[in-house]
Amino acid sequence: GLDTVSFSTKGATYITYVNFLNELRVKTKPEGNSHGIPSLRKSSDDPGSSFVVAG
C-alpha cells in the first residue's frame, strides 16, 4: 500500500501543521533508489476543495 499523510484544517493549530509538514518530509524522503511519494488528501468542509495526490 501507499504511505499516507493527512491534515485537517478543522481545528488545526500551528503545532498540528508543523507535525504534518514533518511527517510529509519524512515520508517523501528517498529510500535507496526509489522515491516514495505519499498519498496526500486535504479534508475540508467544502468537498470542492478536497484533493488526492498519489505517486
Swiss-Prot record:
MF terms in GO: rRNA N-glycosylase activity; toxin activity
Protein name: Antiviral protein GAP-31
InterPro entries found in the cross-reference section: Ribosome-inact_prot_sf, Ribosome_inactivat_prot_sub1
Species classification: Eukaryota, Viridiplantae, Streptophyta, Embryophyta, Tracheophyta
Keywords recorded for this protein, A-Z: Antiviral defense, Hydrolase, Plant defense, Protein synthesis inhibitor, Toxin
Coiled-coil annotated residue ranges, if any: none
Enzyme class: hydrolase
Enzyme Commission number(s) of this protein: 3.2.2.22
